[in-house]
Design a protein with these regions (language model features):
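Helix-terminus/linker motif at the lipid-water interface of multi-pass membrane proteins
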Residues: 42-76, 87, 91-94, 128-138, ...
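Helix-loop junctions and terminal segments of transmembrane helices
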Residues: 70, 74-113, 163-168
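Membrane-interface helix-loop junctions in multi-pass transport and translocation proteins
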Residues: 1-4, 173, 180-215, 242, ...
């Protein structure tokens, strides 16, 4: 806040503001787009913060610490996505009116899906070998959560990639609607399962929330824009994902190494 005041007064920002130049039509159009983004941001805050809050309340700080450690690796994956998100949003907005829009978006989306899936699976496949080296043994329980959270973050990435169409359409209401729906699902699943499966409730609630949001946006976006992922890529991704689920928890290093090699070939 102090920084804001300093910038305003040092630059004399008020000299660049004139109420006479306000255009009500533009103001209304901008407000119509931006106001729904407030509940959207609130929904994202709920999704990100509710899990830790619920875990800390019902299971204590020790369990919350384990969950926080488990989120470290998915956060690295999300940071990778955040780097590309702005350029992808700009690309969709620029090419939204093109004649070959649908073909361009389908091909690009398929490539992005394969790239992020490969990155996600690569991290998961490395975990059996990397986790014991990087994380203290007293946080070993965090290992079981990482695969679930990584898959949740993969769906979060897909949600973000499809939401760019809403941005291009200036349809902030649907952005807010789908985000709030996911936030509600996240809290309900978390509260229902927290006393039954402990920390896993937070991981599964996040996965279910982002999976639900992805399905909703995928179906809705494709009503107006043909932006589907090629079926062979989907089938290959599902098979690799299921394979990693089977090998991640098996505690057999040989099997896990074979899974790592297969994942590397897929990537």
């Amino acid at each position: 806040l102090l920084t804001l005041f300093y910038l305003v007064f040092s630059s004399k920002a008020w000299e660049y503001i004139s109420l006479n130049l306000i255009q009500l039509k533009v103001f209304k159009r901008v407000s119509t787009y931006s106001i729904p983004l407030v509940p959207n941001n609130l929904a994202w805050w709920i999704i990100n913060a509710s899990d830790r809050t619920i875990v800390a309340h019902f299971l204590g700080t020790a369990a919350n610490g384990i969950y926080s450690i488990a989120n470290k690796f998915p956060n690295v994956f999300i940071n990778f996505y955040d780097i590309l998100n702005l350029s992808w949003t700009e690309t969709v907005s620029l090419h939204y009116g093109d004649e070959d829009r649908d073909e361009f978006l389908t091909e690009t989306m398929t490539s992005l899906f394969k790239m992020f899936s490969a990155a996600c699976f690569g991290i998961v496949a490395c975990m059996p070998f990397v986790f014991p080296i990087m994380i203290n043994a007293k946080y070993a329980a965090a290992y079981d959560q990482i695969l679930i959270l990584m898959y949740a973050m993969l769906f979060r990435v897909l949600v973000g990639l499809y939401s760019c169409v809403y941005v291009a359409q200036k349809n902030a209401k649907k952005i807010a609607y789908t985000s709030m729906s996911a936030a509600i699902i996240n809290i309900i699943v978390d509260l229902v399962l927290i006393n039954k499966i402990q920390v896993f409730a937070a991981s599964f609630s996040t996965l279910i929330a982002f999976l639900s949001m992805f399905i909703i946006r995928y179906i809705d976006v494709n009503k107006t824009v043909h932006m589907k992922i090629r079926k062979p890529i989907i089938i290959g991704t599902v098979l690799i994902g299921l394979m990693l689920v089977g090998t991640y928890y098996c505690e057999n290093k040989t099997v896990q190494f074979v899974a790592f090699c297969i994942t590397a070939i897929y990537a």
